[in-house]
Amino acid sequence: MQKIIVTGGLGFIGSNLIKILLQKKYKVINIDKISYASNFYNVKNFKKNKNYSFIKCDINYKKKILNILKRNKPVGIFNIAAETHVDRSIDGPKAFINSNILGVFNLLEAFKNYSKSNNKIKLIHISTDEVFGDLKKGRSHENFAYNPTSPYAASKAASDHLVSSYIKTYDLRAIVTNCSNNYGPRQHPEKLIPKLIYNILKNRPLPIYGKGKNSREWIHVYDHCEALVKVFKKGKLGEFYNIGSNKNLNNLEITKLLLKIAKKIIKINSNVKIKLVKDRPGHDFRYALNSNKIKKRLNWNSKIKFEKGLYETFLWYYKNQSFYDSFDKKDIIRRLGLKND
């Protein structure tokens, strides 16, 4: 049975990817440093699976990563370990530089060293559409120039360039993916959709930045993870692949749709109302990806319709409210990203 390493596997995307990899009969080694966003709740359903194991390790620990590679001899690494919340990057960029740039550098060094004795291993580096920056119209394709605006986006852009440079300079077997906004079960409640659901369930107002017109492309985490597996199996080494759904909605549309869904499941308290709040500094207005490359070359398409996926997502958080209890309440309700005031 082949082994796969997933970095950041206690997080949202990582834990969902591990679930799919186990279903596809891989042995999975989850490497996570256990940050504020890490949650053992996310892996509780398969932590006793004989094909799953966990190692506490920061990807900055180059020697330890190399030892893990030598000991386990995996066929692939999915690098999902990252700081990802834009608002937090505004308040404290240093953590993003440390994890998303220095961490990727040290992971690449360990990978390069190990590749000398194993020239079959592949690295899939997971990135974001935010590296392309604000897009007034059209959709960003893989050859678009990077134009990051937040410290988070800049750190991810730097990591993408690092991976690309190691591919070209050291002939490393790696692929980079850039994905649009994810939603689904087990997402940290600092993010828009789980935070809105939390506020609905707790009878709280629904804070929306600015005028609520900022638009994002939304993809279910299951579709994203299936795309990652497809890239691992069939993707061309050295290439970049965009992963998106072509489904754009603004924040007000998301909120109104969630309220519509909630009314079918629970009784809505009168306190649950949309509340427009001060916008995030440098808030990009629109992101949108052109995903034709992965669709045409790898025969991948997103399958989950947004309205159905959002309904199932609300239902999951409603039925698993103990998930919220596994986080510090202050992390859920606290407003971040206003440090420039």
Regions found by a protein language model. Give the residues of each.
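Active-site helix-initiating loop/hinge in glycosyltransferases
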Residues: 184, 188, 217-220
